[in-house]
Amino acid sequence: KVMNDLLRITKQHNVWIGLVSHLRKMGTAGQSFEEGRLPTVDDIRGSGSIKQISHDILAFARNITAEKEEERNTIKLSVLKSRYTGKTGPAGTCKFDYETGRLHDGLYDDMLDGLNI
């Protein structure tokens, strides 16, 4: 019901609504989300209608256990669903600035050298 209501509002008012969803807890096998594993559509917790009704689904991942501060502060972005283009996959990176609390544009390739992202 909630997702259908949100969809109706977006169409009625020609707006984009961003919805934040938590991830399912995963088993012990493989890389964890805390270690920077990018979520998939199936990792989204909650109603299946989130996956079905959404026009776009974006995923963000950050390795909070990394030793290097630069790596801990680097966020990977990925498009999991795009109803408009159908294109999915890696969408770049951004950096969290603890001093300002802001996200900055992606890192250049030379800055990525040596980072496990």
Q: Where is each model-derived feature located?
A:
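C-terminal regions of RecA-like/P-loop NTPase motor modules
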Residues: 1-16, 25-117
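Active-site beta-loop-alpha junctions enriched in small/polar residues
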Residues: 22
